[in-house]
Amino acid sequence: MNFKYIVAVSFLIASAYARSVKNDEQSLSQRDVLEEESLREIRGIGRKFLGGVKTTFRCGVKDFASKHLYGKRTAEEHEVMKRLEAIMRDLDSLDHPEEASERETRGFNQDEIANLFTKKEKRILGPVLGLVGNALGGLIKKIG
């Protein structure tokens, strides 16, 4: 009778352990799904933000170019226009299909993705703001 009791208790322990392992696997898969959803949200916000920045910047560049394209430009204004065109190419190069974006971000945690996105923002927005400031300063000097 002791042997039957030991076998029954062992079976109960083994089945409880199997259930806990199964529950752990389910919770891990649920966490993976939640992480994927969070990554998609982060990417969506980033795309919308960059899209807005690109649209605004393109409109500004077109207005700036239309005002100064047909007039005489100084060497400094020519350099500013070349830099603006280079920045526009950089902004266009950030457009990736979603699959490539998922491949790049797979394996990163959310903090690493946010840091990478912030670095890209700083790399692009810093020179853009400087060039726009210089261009506006030059226009104000000419007007004033």
Swiss-Prot record:
Signal peptide: 1-18
Removed propeptide positions: 19-43, 74-123
Originating organism: Bombina maxima
Pfam families associated with the record: Bombinin
Keywords, in A-Z order: Amidation, Amphibian defense peptide, Antibiotic, Antimicrobial, Cleavage on pair of basic residues, Cytolysis, Fungicide, Hemolysis, Secreted, Signal
Modification Tyrosine amide, positions: 70
Biological process according to GO: defense response to bacterium; defense response to fungus; killing of cells of another organism
Sequence similarity: Belongs to the bombinin family.
Protein name stated in the entry: Maximins 9/H3
Gene Ontology CC: one annotated term: extracellular region
Coiled-coil features, chain-numbered ranges: none
Residue numbers carrying Isoleucine amide: 143
Role noted for this protein: Maximin-9 shows antimicrobial activity against bacteria and against the fungus C.albicans. It has little hemolytic activity. Maximin-H3 shows antibacterial activity against both Gram-positive and Gram-negative bacteria. It also shows antimicrobial activity against the fungus C.albicans. Shows strong hemolytic activity.
Tissues with expression: Expressed by the skin glands.
Record InterPro entries: Bombinin
TM spans (from-to): none
Intracellular or extracellular location(s): Secreted
